[in-house]
Curated annotation (Swiss-Prot):
The keyword Ribonucleoprotein applies. The keyword Amino-acid biosynthesis does not apply. Belongs to the bacterial ribosomal protein bS6 family. Keywords: Ribonucleoprotein, Ribosomal protein, RNA-binding, rRNA-binding. Binds together with bS18 to 16S ribosomal RNA. This is Small ribosomal subunit protein bS6. CDD domains: bS6_chloro_cyano. It comes from the Bacteria. InterPro entries: Ribosomal_bS6 (IPR000529), Ribosomal_bS6_CS (IPR020815), Ribosomal_bS6_sf (IPR035980), Ribosomal_S6_plastid/chlpt (IPR020814), Transl_elong_EF1B/ribsomal_bS6 (IPR014717).
Length: 108
């Protein structure tokens, strides 16, 4: 069973645009390998952090919205935790509204 998730992560500011794109592709491929579907990627660009994280004041913000089984989240977060390029990440489960549930039931 798949659940809708949103993952937002921050990459180090000293990465080049090419390295940022490679990092995005790496995590997107990791999700696909774990059975994630409907992956939406939003590269929010370089932004100022509210406070210093790992001695960094800026970071590249990237957001994923996707459907995935629960085991995929543990694998994705483990990869991010071990990575030197990710300075912070957060995954939240999205609530499916009643309207969306009805729409899915009608189309099924």
């Amino acid at each position: 069973m798949s659940t809708v998730y949103e993952t937002l992560y921050i990459l180090r500011p000293d990465l080049t645009d090419e390295q940022v794109e490679l990092a995005i592709a790496k995590y997107q491929n990791l999700l696909q390998e774990q059975g994630a579907t409907d992956i939406e990627v939003q590269n929010r660009g370089k932004r100022r952090l509210a406070y210093e994280i790992k001695k960094q004041r800026d970071g590249f913000y990237v957001q994923f919205n996707y459907n995935a089984p629960g085991k995929a989240i543990a694998i994705l977060e483990r990869a991010m935790r071990l990575s030197e390029e990710v300075i912070r990440y957060l995954t939240v489960k999205q609530e499916v509204t009643k309207e969306k549930e009805d729409k899915v039931a009608v189309t099924a």
